[in-house]
């Protein structure tokens, strides 16, 4: 098996790091159950010592996607490495946000490093390798089995200074990541959500239990006093201006039309919109 694995590692252009390797992430050495080795595609560097994990549901609302992308973009723009699991939904949005800022991002897989899951994230996988790293502790060719993901989550929590949970139900695997972060002495952050949405039950519960409420990246930077620029929040970019074309449309709306537009931040049944207006 060892000879076969070595051959696959060389063929796949993978770096194999053991606990005693100088490039093995120092943060993982501080947790009680570090992986004995990591398969790496891309690069892990000293900058990654200032890292935040952004995790959440695989089926987010537009609110969750926008928040995950926006906060990750701002953090990455401040020199923070964004760590997530490359799953659909919040994970993918977090990676995209970091990439949009030309920042660093690391994806931790619950499969072999050569197994792209979901398969439609192939382009994202390649972009992450170019702007950071994809890592896994599972042998090459390992399928993305359900039991692999809780094990994967401890690496996500171990690599970072804090974990931000964006949209998660009460049974979400993201809460496992948050729980591990607490066990490892990391900070836990949560994005508040709609109290009527089951996708926010987990995040709102975390806030009740003491997780730090986050509205933007500055909340995280100030709490941890970290920034690649040396000044917490110095790398933050202002929110993009509303396009002139949209301003003209908004200016021509009646008060009733404005009220309806304000309710369309996520998919709604027509009966619900009528009831609320």
Describe the function of each predicted region.
Residues 1-5:
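Helix-hairpin-helix
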Residues 7-12, 16-277:
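Glycine-biased, small-residue-rich flexible motifs in mid-sequence functional cores and linkers
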């Amino acid at each position: 098996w060892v000879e076969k694995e070595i051959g696959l590692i060389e063929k796949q252009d993978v770096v194999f790091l053991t606990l005693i390797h100088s490039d093995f992430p120092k943060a993982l050495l501080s947790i009680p159950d570090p992986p004995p080795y990591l398969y790496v595609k891309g690069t892990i560097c000293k900058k990654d010592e200032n890292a935040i994990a952004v995790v959440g549901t695989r089926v987010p609302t537009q609110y969750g996607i926008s928040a995950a992308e926006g906060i990750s973009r701002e953090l990455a723009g401040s020199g923070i490495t964004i760590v997530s699991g490359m799953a659909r939904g919040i994970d993918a949005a977090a990676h995209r946000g970091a990439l949009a800022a030309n920042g660093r991002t690391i994806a931790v897989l619950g499969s072999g490093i050569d197994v792209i899951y979901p398969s439609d994230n192939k382009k994202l996988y390649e972009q992450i390798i170019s702007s950071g790293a994809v890592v896994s502790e599972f042998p090459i060719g390992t399928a993305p089995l359900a039991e692999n993901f809780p094990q994967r989550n401890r690496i996500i929590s171990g690599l970072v200074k804090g974990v931000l949970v964006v949209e998660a139900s009460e049974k979400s695997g993201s809460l496992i990541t948050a729980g591990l972060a607490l066990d490892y002495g990391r900070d836990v952050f949560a994005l508040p959500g709609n109290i009527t949405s089951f996708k926010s039950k987990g995040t709102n519960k975390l806030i009740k239990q003491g997780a730090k409420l986050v509205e933007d990246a500055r909340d995280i930077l100030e709490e941890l006093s970290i920034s690649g620029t040396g000044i917490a929040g110095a790398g933050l970019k202002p929110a993009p201006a509303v396009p002139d074309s949209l301003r003209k449309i908004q200016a021509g709306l009646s008060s009733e039309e404005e009220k309806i537009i304000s309710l369309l931040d996520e998919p709604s049944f027509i009966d619900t919109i009528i009831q609320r207006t």
